[in-house]
Amino acid sequence: MSDKKNTEIAVNEGFAALANRDVLNEAMADDCQGLEFSFDRVKLPAGGGTAFEIPSAESDESEMAKDITGVIVYNHPAYAYYHDKYTGGNNPPDCGSFDGVTGIGTPGGNCQNCPYNKFGSGEGQSKLCKNKRMLYILREGELFPITLSLPTGSLKSFTNYVKSQLSRGRKLNQVVTKITLKKATNASGIAFSQAVFAFERMLTAEERNAVAGVSETVKAYAANLTPASLIDDETLVDPETGEIIEPLK
């Protein structure tokens, strides 16, 4: 990347720096050509831990953080169903959905009518199809969002936060949100990490205009996801059941 591009991208600071996204697109065309591109993924701890694991921009090592503060530029459902109980490996789910409406794979079809998407189809009263939510979070001073795969145990708190913002006329991509973790316990007595959401501030008019372009770009990116996008080369523990699962990118 040329010095000129670096200088142009750095003209504005914070979220307003995104006003230089035309320069960023040019830089990406140069630096990412021929590469398989995906956004960095935040990892949730097992056993009720309260620190996120975030990929470092400076090295291959991850950084531990007590909170993530940024703009949720886009979010969508991320459903994953495995016919056989996942025990490890680099295999995608048998069926996945990124809109919560239509499943891709086997059995596929209408998610609302799918028997695997009903409470009680899994262990206890859980669903065989894991219902998650993918959040794309843009932190201040950065040009790419990071992704957080929100597990079922955190969906209620996220839903309540969304409702609280909408009731005040605020869209998620117009506010700065702070996300932390607290230890919770499910009905089976298994501890897991539950996300907590808090409003920090409204974006300025300049920031909102800049972030809107990122939201559209991320939305287009998400529209091209397939069940194979659920593959990851590392396994995690399901924070609700303690099972080894395939995490979402």
Which residue stretches match the model-derived regions?
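Residue-identity detector for threonine
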Residues: T7, T50, T69, T87, ...
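Residues that form generic nucleotide/phosphate-binding pockets
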Residues: A27, D31, Y161-S164, V214
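Extended serine/threonine-enriched, polar tracts that run as long, contiguous segments within proteins
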Residues: K127-M202
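OB-fold ssDNA-binding interfaces and closely related basic DNA-contact patches used
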Residues: M1-G141, L248-K249
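Short glycine-rich, low-complexity/disordered patches
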Residues: D40-V42, T87-G96, C129-K130, N173-I179, ...
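Long, highly charged low-complexity segments enriched in Glu/Asp and Lys/Arg with interspersed Ser/Thr
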Residues: H83, N91, A187-K249
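A broad, low-amplitude sensor of folded, mature protein cores
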Residues: D3-I9, G14, C114, V162-I179, ...
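Exposed alpha-helical structural elements
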Residues: V23, G153-Y161, E206-G213
